[in-house]
Amino acid sequence: MPSEVVNGNFRLDRLPHIWCPGCGHGILMHTVAKAIDELEIDKDKVCIVSGIGCSSRASGYFNYNTVHTTHGRALSFATGIKIANPELKVIVITGDGDATAIGGNHLIHSCRRNIDITTIVFNNNIYGMTGGQYSPTTNTDDKATTAPYRNIDKPFDVCSLSAAAGATFVARGSVYHVKQMINYTKRAITHKGFSVVEGISSCPTYYGRKNKKGSAVDLMKDIKNSCILSDDINKGKDDNKISIGVFKDVSLPEYTKEYQRLVVKANSK
């Protein structure tokens, strides 16, 4: 990570981070910082909110306003922060378990409301911090601590779920596609409405080891070979490929603006 990005955006006394060697979350954290840096946003106008899990430890490293909340509830806290302080750029960092399991209900209703919050989902297909249990995004037939023979569940597609629930900007990048991930994050932050950017990440400690994926480098190569650049969310699914691109970008009434109009109307009665 370039020194100018580190020095300007992170709490140096909190580094080094806690993530395992080869974990992709540090790369995704860098893409968020780089996006904010390139947009030249006033750091005092940024608020990073996270829940619980490996990904959610990221909030403590950023040198902005940060809130480390409870499991699955980051979007609830973020909604309150945004409504009370509509001028803030509120960015939620969450994981696949935090966002789609215990926090799944909050995710779909945040999408439905179209509140101006950017949500970055660090998706490593497993619960890393609690011991390698399978998550709602773990692929069918993959193994995990709680699926020692194989996972029989079908996984959520975070982007399809978010788009269907009403998010007005939906994109997916990966730890290999760093430039694209930075670009998608910048577009999400500047978008007026609820934005979801899924970042495909790597967990060599649990997901890689349980599924015999090899080293951290092998996992990175696997992500590279599994992804295709396309704005068609369904392209490559029949061949077990993952689309990397912007799948939805529409303009619809934003929640805090509608709320403010409602307050004005109520006060005029």
Question: Locations of the language-model features?
Answer:
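Flexible, low-complexity linker and terminal segments
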Residues: 1-5, 201-269
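Conserved thiamine diphosphate
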Residues: 6, 135-187
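Short catalytic-loop micro-motif centered on adjacent basic/acidic residues
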Residues: 19-21, 92-94, 169-174, 196
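Glycine-rich beta-alpha junction loops
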Residues: 52-54, 124-126, 177, 200-206, ...
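Short, hinge-like loop/turn segments at secondary-structure boundaries
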Residues: 65-66, 110, 135-139, 213-216
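Thiamine diphosphate
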Residues: 49-128
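Short coil/turn connectors at secondary-structure junctions
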Residues: 15, 42-46, 84-90, 112-118, ...
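Active-site diphosphate/adenylate-binding microenvironment
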Residues: 2-70
